[in-house]
Amino acid sequence: FPTDGSETATEAAVHAIDLADRHDADIHVLYVVDHERVSQMAPKLGTDHIKETLQEEGETATSEIADRAAAAGLETTTSIREGAPADVITSYAETVNADAIVMGTNGRTGMDRLLLGSVAERVIQTTDVPVTTVKSPADEETEE
């Protein structure tokens, strides 16, 4: 289960925990320190500071999900990696022989989607592991 600490990732965590509980599976919680995000912010704040801040974000995000999973009686492994998110997620899932990937979608539309793409979309296109995506609560409200 990849997380970025967002509301969408938290919603996806609920689904991941439920799925793991129903199938007596363990949960791997992954946070990726995005190199692109680091390089965009580095000129203003410095690479080391950015990486440290994102590492702390990752520790908070993964521990919150791990605590929820543990409360449901699930074994949990947390990991923080650096790189391009879609590549890291795909590689990690293959390395741990994941049965599934559950992740949120960020709901990018228009020019943002064209320029930035979708991590979930890239994961789906590049992995053989089944992927379940969970829409952001904001996306669901927009559809109503």
Which residues make up each language-model segment?
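Gly/Ser-rich helix-loop-strand patches that form or flank binding pockets
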Residues: 95-144
